[in-house]
Design a protein with these regions (language model features):
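Extended hydrophobic-aromatic, low-complexity segments
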Residues: 114-115, 159-161, 178, 198, ...
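Beta-propeller folds
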Residues: 3-12, 19, 94-101, 108, ...
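Short loop/turn segments that connect beta-strands within beta-propeller blades
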Residues: 18-22, 57-61, 107-111, 154-158, ...
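Predominantly a core beta-strand signature of beta-propeller blades
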Residues: 22-25, 61-65, 111-115, 163-166, ...
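Structural motif
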Residues: 9-15, 50-54, 96-104, 142-151, ...
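A generic "binding-loop/recognition-motif" signal
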Residues: 20, 30-32, 49, 59, ...
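C-terminal closing repeat unit and adjoining cap/tail of repeat-based domains
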Residues: 153-155, 162-166, 446-489
Length: 501
């Protein structure tokens, strides 16, 4: 049996498992997305460092690069054509929120890449009994949490499609993951996977060095993300798609229901209170069928006392998503932070060429001077602004990266801190006193929330095997930590005959 990914305490790799003796043998480090050829002689996989697609013999020998991605593109899920003569893979690109996702193939002997289909809502695939490709596609909003099955036929020799895709199902309540057919082709099997993000709050005690059991704040069954806090730390601001698109809400810590702050047809993300406590700021983009219609938006302000929202300034780009999945759309750039004691009031972070650009802005007057630039891959970076507004911290989401950078917005060389063994840092946040940091370390074994003093070593505060945490929001008074875990449920399904629409 061939498996790839992390196993137990090991990191990414390719493994052979003996079904008889239950022994485990690693044949390749720093590799995943492995697929065995139909004749069992070769393995195609992704290198987790270079992101190239590689080939090797079934025993791990004679490894060689097969395909390198173009600049700013990523290649995913390589698999074999049924005849074993071509490699099929997903090609992904995201630029300022515009997602390009398609399937291509290449002959095992090399040559040009041949496109098969393109759809930004493509999610998973398998081969049919007669050699056709069966794949799942997410529905358009407001049904983006459902997917359905399609099929397409092609020439196995050239990889070129034959005819147009054909829809197979018209179901609701399903997201197809790992679809496939049994060996005899008589049963269709798949996982129905339902990810959902909610807002949780946990009390910090003992000077922030201990975390009490978290309590769920949002009780609906939609996607909810935490934003900022009120200045008195009694109210959370959040954004939720409970009405079909993301709107802004506020909810007291002791309340069961959220109150709308800003609603409407546009997408609205990441609310935060202004330093004077009079306005709620948030980012806004026009809504489109398959993601943002434009790659620019606005920072808006809504009066806390009530009334219409007003534009503060234009912003470029759109926070990235994971294959267009709104459940995982909390990170990315642009993003902003406001702090009570910040010299500039608020700071905007935007994606540059292999760097993050920080710019000051005023909630009433708009964009001001550029403050600093940090050289880092923005596609895998997270950041936060210190409570006094003079420093930023940047972390990297990578399974080998356990370093964070702290940089002064006044200039100078960034300070590097190691939080080893905690890697894959999905979120980072300053503690209210500015003397420590909170980090979310994500792995296949769940998420760990870690406290990192600026002058000491990391300490584990909380661990949850079934959660992926992509946001951390400490309250201004230092008594609470809000976060947004993605909790995924998965059930295996089997159908006696292949689905038809």
């Amino acid at each position: 049996m061939l498996v790839s990914g992390p196993v137990a305490q090991e990191k990414q790799g390719i493994w052979l498992i003996s079904v008889i003796g239950a022994t485990l043998k690693k044949i390749r480090d720093d590799a995943y997305d492995a697929s065995l050829s139909p004749d069992g002689s070769q393995i195609v996989f992704r290198d987790s460092i270079t992101r190239d697609i590689w080939l090797m013999n079934a025993d791990g020998g004679q490894a060689r690069s097969f395909l390198k991605p173009e600049e700013s593109y990523n290649l995913y899920s390589p698999t074999w054509f049924p005849n074993g003569k071509r490699i099929l893979y997903a090609k992904y690109h995201e630029n300022n929120g515009e997602v390009s996702l398609g399937l291509e193939s290449r002959d095992l002997k090399g040559g040009d890449m041949v496109p098969l289909l393109s759809n930004p809502r493509l999610t998973d695939l398998c081969w049919g009994q007669s050699g056709q490709l069966i794949y799942s596609v997410r529905e358009r909003p407001p049904n983006q949490y459902d997917s359905n099955l399609w099929e397409i036929r092609f020439d196995e020799g050239t990889g070129k499609p034959r005819g147009n895709p054909r829809r197979l199902t018209d179901w609701t309540g399903f997201i197809f993951v790992d679809p496939g057919l049994t060996a005899d082709g008589n049963r269709f099997v798949f996982l129905n996977v339902r990810p959902q993000s909610d807002v949780y709050v946990a009390a910090l005690t003992n000077g922030g060095s201990e975390l009490k059991a978290p309590q769920r704040v949002t009780l609906d069954e939609r996607t909810d993300w935490p934003g900022g806090w009120s200045l008195d730390s009694k109210t959370m601001f959040l954004y939720s798609d409970r009405n079909g698109n993301f709107d802004i809400y506020k909810q007291g810590l002791n309340e069961r229901n959220a109150e709308p702050v800003a609603t409407g047809s546009d997408e609205k993300w990441a609310p935060q209170i202004t330093p004077d406590g009079k306005w709620v700021l948030y980012m806004q983009w026009s809504k489109a069928i398959d993601g943002p219609a434009v790659n620019s938006g606005k920072i808006m302000r809504s009066p806390l006392a009530g009334g219409p929202s007003e534009a503060v300034m234009d912003i470029k780009g759109h926070p990235e998503t994971l294959f267009g999945d709104p459940t995982y759309s909390v990170g990315g750039f642009p993003s902003f932070r406001c702090r009570l004691h910040a010299p500039s009031g608020c700071v905007l972070a935007e994606k540059g060429d292999k760097q993050i650009v920080f710019t000051a802005f005023d909630p009433l007057q708009g964009r001001k001077a550029e403050l600093a630039k940090i050289s880092v891959d923005p596609d895998s970076a997270n950041w936060d602004l210190s409570p006094d507004g003079t420093r930023v911290v940047v972390s990297i989401f990578d399974y080998k990266a356990a370093d964070i950078q702290i940089a002064s917005l006044a200039g100078g060389t960034p300070q590097k801190l190691s939080v080893m063994p905690w890697t894959e840092l999905g979120a980072v946040a300053w503690a209210a006193d500015g003397k420590s940091l909170f980090l979310a370390s994500i792995s296949s074994r769940g998420t760990s929330i870690v406290r990192m003093p600026l002058t000491g070593g990391p300490k584990l505060l909380f661990k949850q095997p079934s959660w992926d945490i992509f946001s951390l929001m400490p309250s201004p008074d230092g008594r609470y930590l809000a976060f947004g875990p993605v909790i995924t449920t998965a059930n295996a399904w089997t159908i006696a005959s292949f689905p038809r629409k």
